[in-house]
Amino acid sequence: MPGAAKNVEAPEWYVYQFEVRKVPFYVGIGHRERASDRLRWVCSQIKRELAGKPGKWDLHTRVIKYFILCPEPVTHRCICKGLCRADALKVEKRRIIDLRSSGHVIANIQYNRRPLPSPEEVIKFIRKHPKPAGLSCRRQA
């Protein structure tokens, strides 16, 4: 039902991560299609800028924008589903902490290092990993 309030107790929530080159750089929670909606939203902001209008950007959407324009595939992967919102938030926090403790440079605001990494630092971390065969990106970070 469009516009209906989300039931935070219903097991309809999931945890996802955005990846480039199979390198996770952002972890979030979603309800229905939020993760794939985020990619469409970034594309809409790019179109706004191309039309001379201002885009709205934050840390992870700047990273997504860079790789969309590169172009290099940005994928989202569901890492846990069928959760209530409170459990999804716990899984999200644990995943962010695990990625950070393993040395990942990520684009999350919550549970990330301070000062936050710049988009360029996140991009540089991703780009130091080998590209899957067949990808080409000439744009520099």
Model regions and ranges:
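BZIP DNA-binding basic region
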Residues: 23-24, 103-121
